[in-house]
């Protein structure tokens, strides 16, 4: 049986960030295993259709602490300006990086680039062992350690098990850590697109009666589209050919960026919120989407998860001789409670307010957007959380 200080299940962005963060903070003194089921081929870049994620300013500040941002900045697209509007109504608000002032409000990175970069970083951390492709098939918790059996027959023992294996976490299911589910009755249609006008680092969020439509700036003048629709509308939209889809998208978004010229591969997924009230258990910590999965309306999902990672890494440093000790896990749970609760509430409220076409909601949200555009003090609380500059 191979012995480690920490075993992390899930080697995507959350799990790998935690491994690199703990390695950096501990000076490589803790042995870490990362178990990942899917073998990534970083040489087979998806090109135009590469999936992207937005990193808040707070997330960038955290990544800097682990010496991970400098390399990532080379392929990141800065968000200089955010425009928020309500389709068919006058309410709108703008946020510009010069108002803060900061270099950028956030950055957009492509997941393939991050994966390749993290793979390069991994080679510099000899204490991190990537077990891939492999998946957890059995977990046994003892008083002082956790024993994990993999599907290839390998046995691992560690002082701490970290579940970073997504919303449908196999670890959490095996250990019966329950999740609260809420169906937003919306489907996200995602694609990369190109417009006639250059995005110039601008991000857009447009609220419609069926749900929000967001465009994030990417490299090579592409934009990442997330279009939230009612299920029947999403089915119809997905059935359109590219020309028809362009027309529908143009009608929903408008002409602020000119004509939509190129539409990449489209995919869709149902939007559900999952939340595990209990983000720790005996010798178990839960991070990222395994702890909570949010609606993409405010781009808070990964940015909330990175704050899980930073807090857990700091908590581990308080008791490096036993990363799974009760004092570590109770500190992590206590410090994350308020931020998780507030971000979850904010995201859910935004969905219900801005995905609703009742007259009272339309009037309220348009007055709210207009007020925020004219009163910085009203914009500040939402801006602070959007930028990820919140206490952990």
Language-model regions: role of each:
Residues 1-12, 33:
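Beta1/beta-strand and adjacent pyrophosphate-binding region of the FAD-binding site
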Residues 15:
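N-terminal Rossmann-fold NAD(P) dinucleotide-binding loop
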Residues 23-48:
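Glycine-rich FAD pyrophosphate-binding loop
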Residues 46-87:
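N-terminal FAD cofactor-binding segment of flavoenzymes
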Residues 63, 160-259, 263-266:
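Conserved FAD-binding catalytic core of PHBH/FMO-like flavoproteins
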Residues 75-174, 182-187:
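Conserved N-terminal helical subregion
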Residues 233-235, 239-326:
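FAD/FMN-dependent oxidoreductases across multiple families
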Residues 314-392:
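C-terminal helical "tail/cap" subdomain of flavin- and related membrane-associated enzymes
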């Amino acid at each position: 049986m191979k012995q480690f200080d920490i075993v992390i299940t899930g080697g995507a962005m959350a799990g790998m960030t935690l491994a690199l963060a703990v390695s950096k903070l501990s000076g490589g003194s803790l042995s870490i295993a990362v178990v990942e089921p899917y073998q990534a081929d970083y040489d087979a870049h998806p090109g135009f259709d590469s999936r992207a994620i937005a990193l808040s300013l707070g997330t960038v500040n955290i990544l800097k602490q682990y010496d991970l941002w400098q390399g990532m900045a080379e392929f990141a697209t800065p968000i200089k300006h955010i425009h928020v509007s309500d389709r068919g109504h006058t309410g709108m608000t703008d946020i510009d990086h010069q108002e803060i002032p900061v270099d950028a409000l956030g950055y957009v990175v492509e997941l393939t680039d991050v994966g390749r970069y993290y793979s390069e970083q991994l080679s510099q951390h000899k204490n991190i062992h990537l077990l891939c492709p492999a998946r957890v098939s059995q977990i046994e918790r003892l008083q002082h350690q956790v024993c994990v059996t993999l599907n290839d027959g390998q046995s691992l023992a560690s002082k701490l098990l970290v579940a970073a294996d997504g919303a449908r976490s196999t670890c959490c299911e095996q250990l019966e850590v329950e999740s609260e589910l809420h169906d937003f009755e919306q489907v996200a249609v995602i694609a990369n697109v190109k417009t006639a006008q250059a995005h110039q680092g601008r991000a857009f969020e447009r609220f419609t009666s069926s749900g929000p439509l967001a465009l994030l700036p990417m490299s090579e003048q592409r934009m990442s589209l997330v279009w939230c629709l009612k299920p029947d509308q999403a089915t119809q939209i997905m059935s359109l050919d590219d020309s028809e889809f362009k027309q529908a998208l143009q009608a929903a978004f408008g002409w602020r960026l000119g004509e939509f010229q190129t539409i990449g591969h489209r995919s869709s997924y149902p939007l559900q919120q999952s939340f595990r009230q209990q983000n720790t258990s005996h010798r178990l910590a839960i991070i990222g989407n395994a702890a909570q999965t949010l609606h993409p309306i405010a781009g808070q999902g990964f940015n909330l998860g990175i704050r899980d990672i930073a807090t857990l890494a700091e908590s581990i440093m308080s008791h490096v001789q036993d990363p799974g000790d009760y004092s570590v896990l109770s500190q992590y749970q206590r410090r994350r409670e308020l931020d998780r609760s507030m971000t979850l509430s904010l995201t859910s409220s935004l969905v219900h307010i801005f995905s609703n076409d009742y007259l009272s909601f339309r009037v309220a949200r348009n007055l709210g957007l207009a007020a925020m555009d004219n009163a910085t003090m009203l914009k500040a609380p939402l801006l602070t959380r959007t930028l990820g500059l919140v206490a952990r």
